[in-house]
Swiss-Prot record:
SUPFAM superfamilies the UniProt entry points to: RibA-like
Co-factor note (free text): Binds 1 zinc ion per subunit.
Protein name (record): GTP cyclohydrolase-2
Role according to the record: Catalyzes the conversion of GTP to 2,5-diamino-6-ribosylamino-4(3H)-pyrimidinone 5'-phosphate (DARP), formate and pyrophosphate.
Alphabetical keyword list: GTP-binding, Hydrolase, Metal-binding, Nucleotide-binding, Riboflavin biosynthesis, Zinc
A single cellular component GO annotation: cytosol
EC assignment: 3.5.4.25
Top-rank lineage group of the source organism: Bacteria
GO molecular function: GTP binding; GTP cyclohydrolase II activity; zinc ion binding
Residue positions binding Zn(2+): 55, 66, 68
Entry binding sites for GTP: 50-54, 71, 93-95, 115, 150, 155
Keyword Cytoplasm attributed: no
Annotated family: Belongs to the GTP cyclohydrolase II family.
Gene field: ribA
Length: 197
């Protein structure tokens, strides 16, 4: 399929918000990723999409430290409402540092550091994700043009650099609470996320 990912299998995935088709992909090193699709995404028209990085704490454990779970839920609802779209779910926990390192970083955040300071203090990258994986999935599914649900300009640029036409960026401002207010501000101030529209 591509040098980054290989397609493995697809299945029907009924959810609280509707039925998706789940497509499984695997990196050469064994890391697995999925894409959830609704409708025909390969007809050449711009496809509503979200590139979502795995967040066990937010997506599955409902942590209020981040906005990941609410973003995933909002994206799934939006794709179902549109009747056509794709959610690329990349297994890049903790902005790519892994779950255990994320727990270590959370410990430092509990002591007063922000999300960027904690990663740096641990000698870890601030963001180690590789959004080119999404481009490989789009390529396999025949997607060349997207409407991207994101606040992260790096996702937009990576797709543009890969030849994907990003016709629209749709802000995804959900899940703010007292626990994650500083985290969201840090994403805006230090990571360039577009949090004010």
């Amino acid at each position: 399929m591509s040098e980054l990912l290989n397609y493995v299998a697809s299945c029907r995935l009924p959810t609280e918000w509707g039925v998706f088709t789940m497509h499984g992909f695997e990196e050469a090193g064994g890391q697995e990723h999925v894409a959830l699709t609704v409708g025909d995404c390969s007809d050449g028209n711009p496809v509503l999409t979200r590139i979502h990085s795995e967040c066990l704490t937010g997506d599955a454990l409902f942590s209020k430290k981040c906005d990941c779970g609410p973003q995933l839920e909002a994206a799934m609802k939006a794709v179902q409402a549109e009747g056509r779209g794709i959610i690329v779910y990349l297994r890049q926990e903790g902005r790519g540092i892994g779950l255990i390192n994320k727990i270590r970083a959370y410990h430092l955040q509990d002591q007063g550091m922000d999300t960027v300071e904690a990663n740096v203090a641990l000698g870890l990258p601030v963001d180690a994700r590789d959004f080119r994986l999404a481009q490989s999935i789009y390529e396999y599914l025949g997607i060349r043009s997207v409407k991207l649900l994101t606040n992260n300009p790096e996702k937009i640029q990576t797709l543009k650099d890969a030849g994907i036409n990003v016709v629209e960026r749709i802000p995804l401002h959900v899940g703010e609470n007292l626990e994650n207010k500083r985290y969201l501000q840090t994403k805006a101030d230090k990571l360039g996320h577009l949090m004010s529209e």
